[in-house]
């Protein structure tokens, strides 16, 4: 049996021993953000970029976070892990609220939770469904509020699709859990960053890598119908 290492509010234990209060605002309001950090051969990929994005997320929802402590906990999880390849999931919640209210207290104690799990990383062909982007207006924040993604992706699953590609009023945004790239007229294209798109770490790494090879990436607004004439398309996550 695989034993998953975890940390909750600074206390390290096995994942099966972690206990979270039902009064956590992560449960009642999805009042939380998260980050997913991949690692290969026990080495975290783009740690600083992931930490910077987590910092932007907590800043956006007015949570003060000891980012050095978070980084230390992530590294400790990796050091204690038996897995060579996988990812670290780390979540920050505003805290517990015994009286359910949309308005939160400034004196709440934040809750942090992380765990590490094995994962095989591979490139594979996908069947995708194109659908309307029905998510909220701040998808640039890596929020745990993912119900629209869940519903749309499970609808796609019922049609034997692996992923969704979303558009807002006809303009491409992103996939359910990844960023979109495609080639058209021998040009690499990807939707511009906006409130409707999460600034993917792999997205930025790929754009930089292509630029270093002299391959320009065109970022812009694209109608979803343009995918029909694309030479190829891929998702990054």
Where are these regions (language model features)?
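Helix-start/capping segments and mature chain N-termini
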Residues: 1-76, 98-237
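Phosphate/pyrophosphate-binding loops at sites that engage ATP/ADP/AMP, CoA/4′-phosphopantetheine
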Residues: 78-82
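Ordered, amphipathic secondary-structure segments that act as subunit-interaction surfaces
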Residues: 83-92, 99
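Short, well-ordered beta-to-alpha junction loops that form the rim of enzyme active sites
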Residues: 92-93, 169
